[in-house]
Amino acid sequence: MRLLILILLSVLVLFQHDFWFGSNGFLDYRQNAEKIKENQAENEKLSQRNQRINAEIQGLTKGFEAIEERARMQHGLVKENEVFYHIVKESK
């Protein structure tokens, strides 16, 4: 009877060891869950960035005003017979 109890306890210990420390065990599960959370956060950032870029693309393809604004701001372009004033804030 003692031998049977000893064998059952050793089998239980082996199963517990595999559960906690084995491949695909509890510790691996926790690490993978953390990686999933990090990846989901990164995906959310990228999704928001994609939405901003998509909105910018839609603005550029649909409206002339967006193209004109971009040309003025990024390239300093002005219309014919137009005076452009660039006001620079004084640094302290």
Curated annotation (Swiss-Prot):
InterPro entries per UniProt: Cell_div_FtsB, FtsL/DivIC
GO biological process assignments: FtsZ-dependent cytokinesis
Entry membrane topology: Single-pass type II membrane protein
Chain coiled-coil ranges: 28-63
Subcellular location, principal: membrane
Gene Ontology cellular-component annotations: cell division site; cell septum; plasma membrane
Function: Essential cell division protein. May link together the upstream cell division proteins, which are predominantly cytoplasmic, with the downstream cell division proteins, which are predominantly periplasmic.
Entry protein name: Cell division protein FtsB
Annotated source species: Haemophilus influenzae (strain PittEE)
